[in-house]
């Protein structure tokens, strides 16, 4: 982590909190590769759409280390203060979580502030969890082993 922070400091860019949400998102996307971790090859990587309570179709990506049925499933909420971040910025991290933990990971593109005010992101997370619980077997996950996490 020290090397990541040092590279960020050397880049000399304005801190994210001093930028507009749009500019911060662009900068965050551009810096997504700062971890320099190779992209893990997984048995399954699938893009999904999960319905929110208001009919909005949330983009999501499922990562699975194997094609075995009955794997535990983690609903992953990317970091970024509910203002920045996306499936793309956390793709490598979610691949590593799936590979190292031996579980499915579903990364959710929840709606971001300030365009979508509270409680949009938490409602999106709850709606996604409910949908995953009711569709776990279709996804080949174990419905008794669901978790929520993120950074």
Regions found by a protein language model. Give the residues of each.
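Serine-hydrolase catalytic-loop signature spanning alpha/beta hydrolases and amidase-signature enzymes
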Residues: 76, 81-84, 89, 105, ...
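Gly/Ser-rich "nucleophile elbow"/oxyanion-hole loop immediately N-terminal to the catalytic nucleophile
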Residues: 133-149
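Short amphipathic alpha-helix adjacent to the substrate-entry channel of hydrolases
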Residues: 87-108, 123
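A glycine/proline-hinged amphipathic helix-loop "lid/cap" segment
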Residues: 1-58, 62
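Short beta-to-alpha linker loops that shape the active-site pocket of alpha/beta-hydrolase fold enzymes
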Residues: 109-113
């Amino acid at each position: 982590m020290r090397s990541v922070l040092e590279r960020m400091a050397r880049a000399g860019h304005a801190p994210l909190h001093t930028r507009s949400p749009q500019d911060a998102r662009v900068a965050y996307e551009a810096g997504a590769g700062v971890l320099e971790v190779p992209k893990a090859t997984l048995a399954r990587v699938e893009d999904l759409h999960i319905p929110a309570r208001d009919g909005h179709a949330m983009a999501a990506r499922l990562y699975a280390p194997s094609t075995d049925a009955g794997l535990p499933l983690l609903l992953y909420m990317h970091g970024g203060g509910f203002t920045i971040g996306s499936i793309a910025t956390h793709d490598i991290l979610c691949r590593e979580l799936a590979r190292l933990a031996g579980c499915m990971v579903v990364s959710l593109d929840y709606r971001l502030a300030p365009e979508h005010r509270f409680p949009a992101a938490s409602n999106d997370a709850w709606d996604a969890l409910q949908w995953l619980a009711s569709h776990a077997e279709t996804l080949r996950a174990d419905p008794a082993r669901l978790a929520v996490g993120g950074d």
